[in-house]
Amino acid sequence: MSTITTGQIAKLLWPGLNARWGTKYNEYAMEWKDLVDVETSDKAYEEDQEMTGFGLAPIKAHGASIVYDTASQGITSRYTHLAYALGFIITHEAIQDNLYEKIGMQRTGSLAFSMRQTKENVVANMYNRAFNSSYLGADGAVLLSTAHPSLSGNQSNTLAVAADLSEASLEDMCILIGKMTNSRGMKISVQPRSLIVPIDLEFEAARILKSTSQSGTANNDINALRSMGMFPDGIKVNHYLTDTDAFFIRTNVDDGLKLFQREAASFAQDEDFDTSNIKYKAYERYSTGWSDWRGLAGSPGA
């Protein structure tokens, strides 16, 4: 168990320091909120249940009986909440002898920063692992797959041939999204909402979606993606995505990627009677995952 003592903050025990740096930087806005829908929970876990619905109605011949269809349960997605916690200990002497900002308050700010960064990484890792076969969804497939099982056969939310971010690949992805069906193969209105990219693709994404004319050509054609308003929620740059050429599209499908907040971040402190050391801790509990894979489409890049 690590403890902050006077030896670890020796410079803070003497007057004359001009500045202390390394723990106070500007932060990005909470980017994880662009990646998931947020719900609350008051249980140990949450479950989402797929229901399959009915197929097309057949022709009924004169005098023939009606064909009766059946609806059934599909996949069950379980969200088991995990606790994330971190703390630190400071000796009584280190607190009393520090000549500058109250060291407990300063370190508490660092603790809050660590908790926020943790949530950013936990949520972004669903995207970072979207093509990783070690991380499967309730249907037994990776988040972005060409082989999501359904009653009407395998379905896809990624291109058959992986492609880098371009006007053509985005158009192909939008077509793929527009052809999505439910588990029974019925047409459903799935629409792109936002384009999610790592910082490495920020400028390329802006050129593709914000140019008035077709991007990267001498043609006078319109920028169809822009003129048709294909991404009404715009470009979302996420600094926690690790693949420099992967890109993702969130859709309007409900019950896609989720974060269930079980317990909000809380902070506490206490003093040890025997040592007079002060303990500070942060604690938060939540779960992440996805139910309907149609909530996301994407490509790992070529």
What are these regions (language model features)?
Residues S77-S134, L195, Y280-A282:
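Long, contiguous amphipathic alpha-helices that act as assembly "spine/axial" helices in icosahedral shell
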Residues S2-K11, L143-N182, K187-S194, D200-A302:
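Sequence/fold signature of self-assembling virion shell proteins
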Residues W21, Y25, A29, K33, ...:
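Residue-level signal for secondary-structure boundary elements
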